Amino acid sequence: MSKPIVMERGVKYRDADKMALIPVKNVATEREALLRKPEWMKIKLPADSTRIQGIKAAMRKNGLHSVCEEASCPNLAECFNHGTATFMILGAICTRRCPFCDVAHGRPVAPDTNEPLKLAQTIADMALRYVVITSVDRDDLRDGGAQHFADCITAIREKSPAIKIETLVPDFRGRMDRALEILNATPPDVFNHNLENVPRVYRQVRPGADYNWSLKLLERFKEAHPEIPTKSGLMVGLGETNAEIIEVMRDLRRHGVTMLTLGQYLQPSRHHLPVQRYVSPEEFDEMKAEAMAMGFTHAACGPFVRSSYHADMQAKGLEVK
């Protein structure tokens, strides 16, 4: 029997080390058991990476993180090449250990009190007009990191008054009242929280999270700010069915959510949950049609769609696949 891992503060635990800490064990996928990617999942990288390297350099210079890099997003090259990025605040170590996610798990250090100003200055220097701010889960903080979100929103708006800000927040487990009290005083332009998948597979996909809690978070923010769009995202390929996805979409509408993202799950490493199916572009189109018929004002559905993928276009209601 292997020795238990003793986590050191500030150390990133990834792949096999991270999965070893999850109560519901996941057996590493052997190469021959991997599903072959269909043609529609092939990514063409840009010929010129100058813009990509420039954004990475700006991040490193200011000690900032992007979820694009930390979560190994397949759209990194495209988004960075277009000068867009989703900033990840509160460090790069998550207190949760979801087996679909490539963000590191561990015992995070205290939040950087200078991060809001550094973030605001970086965004101003990049002359961004739309920005997405997300974070790791911080179950070690009494407010789940809500005040840090609010401080970042305030600092960004001071330096870039015309900017639109979307927040992709964690579930603030056990801290919803306090978190919403803080965020209600400094609301974003779009409030996003991802359900990720269907309730039947939550124990395997989102250990430590609760489906109904996440729905309630979205509903309560919408009740306080009916004029602000609420948004949520789902992944397919984790053992769910299309019928179950459509039922989750109905739950989201019942809780006031108006914007939806739906994309294909991709396995970050052999130690993460395996891809159980690849959903075709035609099926994504069918689910988008279902979403629009339910009353979603915007629905971005496609193999490479992620919650913050072309978020500015999503907010404008433009076609995103």
From Swiss-Prot:
Binding-site positions, [4Fe-4S] cluster 1: 68, 73, 79, 308
Pathway: Protein modification; protein lipoylation via endogenous pathway; protein N(6)-(lipoyl)lysine from octanoyl-[acyl-carrier-protein]: step 2/2
Keywords associated with the record: 4Fe-4S, Cytoplasm, Iron, Iron-sulfur, Metal-binding, S-adenosyl-L-methionine, Transferase
EC category: transferase
Domain Radical SAM core: 80-297
Single Gene Ontology MF annotation: lipoate synthase activity
One Pfam family matching this protein: Radical_SAM
Protein localization: Cytoplasm
Catalytic activity: [[Fe-S] cluster scaffold protein carrying a second [4Fe-4S](2+) cluster] + N(6)-octanoyl-L-lysyl-[protein] + 2 oxidized [2Fe-2S]-[ferredoxin] + 2 S-adenosyl-L-methionine + 4 H(+) = [[Fe-S] cluster scaffold protein] + N(6)-[(R)-dihydrolipoyl]-L-lysyl-[protein] + 4 Fe(3+) + 2 hydrogen sulfide + 2 5'-deoxyadenosine + 2 L-methionine + 2 reduced [2Fe-2S]-[ferredoxin]
EC number per UniProt: 2.8.1.8
UniProt key word 4Fe-4S: yes
Cofactor: [4Fe-4S] cluster
GO cellular component: cytoplasm
Classification via HAMAP family: Lipoyl_synth
Family the UniProt entry places it in: Belongs to the radical SAM superfamily. Lipoyl synthase family.
Designated name of the protein: Lipoyl synthase
Organism: Citrobacter koseri (strain ATCC BAA-895 / CDC 4225-83 / SGSC4696)
